[in-house]
A protein has these predicted regions:
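Conserved ATPase-coupling elements of RecA-like P-loop NTPase cores
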Residues: 51, 109-115, 125-141, 302-305
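Conserved interdomain linker/interface between the two RecA-like ATPase lobes of SF2 helicase motors
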Residues: 173-242
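Walker A/P-loop
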Residues: 4-24
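Inter-Walker segment of RecA-like/P-loop motor cores
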Residues: 62-110
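Conserved helicase motor "Helicase C" RecA-like lobe of SF1/SF2 P-loop NTPases
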Residues: 232-259
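Post-DEXD/H (motif II) to motif III coupling segment of the RecA-like Helicase ATP-binding lobe
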Residues: 128-190
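Conserved Walker A/P-loop ATP-binding site and its immediately adjacent core
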Residues: 18-20, 34-59, 73, 230-236
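Conserved RecA-like P-loop NTPase helicase motor core
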Residues: 128, 260-372
Length: 377
């Protein structure tokens, strides 16, 4: 990164992208003897909060001021008002100290409107930056910031001139680092995935989902499971219109789900987002057996401890599949030697999902290449 002021850093999920950002920022602070402004961009408020926590576990705050620019409630000062952003940053800089800003792609334009000097900007899960609403601010900081880096495990390229993609070197620079997943597996940083495709009979759709998932859980003796559903509607139907939750409880499992529409639910009780993730990580570290269902909110970058397996109920693009697999290949106890990836096949979508998952695993873990998603039109 020191040899390039702009570029893409491609590292598989669990490979240490956040640590690269932190080390780069700390080195910058040590070598440049004046206050600097760092911006860290995340796709979700939840991930922005997590990144802030991880930064502050290592970076000393005696000469660094922390600002959050998004609509979430956090312990640090937070605002989306450009004038207040401008004032906060300039007060820190005028005293010769650093300003670290954590924001989301949704709110990045607010920092652009604040008209402040940004020395280094890190785009986490950078494949999100190509979205139509986010690209203008991304393009602006690519040109305006002194140093600009795009971190992702799953680049998104465009095959049409009418839509942005990370294969645009003027905005995204070149790939300056590409770490192959097999290397991380060999060195013991992440675990290899094991794909199990289970063909199941069809029937009433609601009960089919329930029975097929339960059969898959039973057959693989799983304790801590992530279920990737097709939609929030599918999760709600599974919980409300089948005996899935009763079946889980009979087997000694707790159950929980979180979506942007329904909020967080644990064993049928609505809870705060903070309690949900505290409980999820607590259960991940102890002997509690649980199933967590999600549509997309757990996919990108969120640290969830202890997950053994992901069960796909829906097809996704390469990014969604790769990110979901990434939740279960993080290191666990000595008994965890792989991350299980289960695809119950009981309709045409299931067959397509199985093929997509196999393709992603082959590309990332056998060929050692990133799973690139392509925009074709």
């Amino acid at each position: 990164m020191w040899n390039n002021n702009k570029g893409q850093v491609i590292i598989p999920t669990g490979g240490g992208k956040t640590m690269c950002m932190i080390e780069d920022a700390m080195t910058n602070m040590d070598l440049v003897k004046r206050g600097q402004t760092f911006v860290v961009v995340a796709p979700r408020i939840l991930l922005a909060e997590q990144l802030c926590k991880e930064f502050l576990e290592i970076i000393p705050t005696n000469n660094a001021h922390i600002l959050h620019v998004h609509s979430g409630e956090v312990e640090h000062y937070h605002t989306t008002n450009p004038k207040k952003i401008h004032l906060f940053n300039n007060v820190a800089r005028s005293s010769g100290e650093h300003c670290i800003i954590f924001t989301t792609y949704h709110s990045l334009h607010r920092i652009q409107e604040a008209d402040i000097e940004v020395n280094t900007i890190y785009f986490d899960e950078a494949h999100n930056s190509v979205q139509r609403n986010f690209f203008p601010a991304t393009e602006y900081f690519s040109a305006d910031a002194d140093r600009c880096y795009f971190f992702t495990a799953t680049p998104k390229h465009s095959l049409t001139i009418f839509k942005p993609g990370m294969n645009d070197p003027e905005v995204y620079g070149q790939v300056i680092c590409n770490v192959p997943a097999p290397h991380l597996v060999e060195e013991g940083y992440i675990l290899p995935p094991k794909v199990v495709v289970k063909e199941l009979p069809t029937g009433d759709q609601r009960q089919s989902d329930c029975k097929n998932l339960i059969d898959t859980i039973d057959d693989n003796s799983l304790s801590k499971i992530l279920i990737a559903a097709r939609s929030t509607k599918q999760i709600v139907k599974l919980v409300a219109e089948s005996d899935f939750c009763n079946q889980l409880q009979e087997r000694g499992y707790n159950w929980m789900f979180i979506t942007s529409k329904t909020g967080a639910i644990i064993n049928g009780k609505k809870v705060s987002r903070e309690e949900f993730f505290h409980t999820l990580n607590k259960w991940g570290e102890d002997e509690t057996r649980f199933v967590v269902m999600h549509h997309s909110i757990l996919s990108e970058g969120i640290n969830v401890k202890g997950l053994e397996a992901v069960l796909f109920m829906r097809n996704m693009d390469y990014i969604g599949i790769s990110q979901s697999i990434g939740r279960v290949i993080r290191l666990g106890g000595a008994e965890k030697t792989f991350g299980l990836v289960c695809v119950p096949v009981f309709d045409k979508v299931g067959i397509g999902t199985a093929r997509s998952v196999q393709s992603v695993v082959n590309t990332v873990f056998n060929e050692g290449q990133p799973a690139i998603s392509e925009v074709r039109r």
